[in-house]
């Protein structure tokens, strides 16, 4: 696992982040998996490796969580190929106290609480299928309104 993480960390495209939009596609060109969220502050924690293995991602996120106790939020892991919300989600979305890298490679914690979309292969207890919406607005570091799951 560690070797895979280190290898993937060396692939620059896996760390690409888009700014000023709802999506933060940190695995662009590597797995096609996109993350969309909002940030409220930054802290330091473990980067997410370039992988489609949801369980492994969750274990990395749990490590990330431990660096920022007391924070709450959600992470959407989706299979959208672009930033226009086209496509059907097929990977789970989980209610985690978690954090993701921002455009400077720092980490912010999330503030959108939500119901979650789950896949057949990675659904966790308590997940509920739900459509996407722009109704969840957090207080990010800039004035952007981020897309979240209601």
From Swiss-Prot:
Alphabetic keyword roster: Signal
Superkingdom: Eukaryota
Signal sequence segment: 1-14
UniProt name for this protein: Plasmin C
Organism: Physarum polycephalum (Slime mold)
Gene name for this UniProt entry: PLSC
């Amino acid at each position: 696992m560690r070797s895979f993480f280190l290898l993937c960390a060396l692939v620059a495209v896996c760390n690409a982040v888009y700014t000023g939009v709802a999506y933060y596609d940190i695995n662009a060109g590597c797995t096609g998996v996109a993350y969309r969220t909002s940030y409220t502050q930054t802290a330091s924690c473990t980067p997410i490796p370039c992988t489609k293995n949801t369980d492994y991602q969750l274990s990395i996120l749990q490590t990330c969580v431990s660096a920022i106790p007391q924070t709450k939020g959600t992470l959407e892991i989706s299979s959208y190929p672009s930033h226009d919300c086209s496509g059907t989600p097929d990977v789970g979305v989980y209610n985690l106290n978690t954090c993701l890298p921002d455009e400077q490679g720092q980490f912010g914690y999330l503030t959108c609480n939500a119901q979650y979309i789950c896949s057949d292969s990675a659904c966790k207890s308590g997940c509920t299928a739900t459509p996407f919406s722009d109704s969840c607005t957090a207080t990010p570091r800039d004035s952007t309104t981020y897309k979240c799951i209601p």
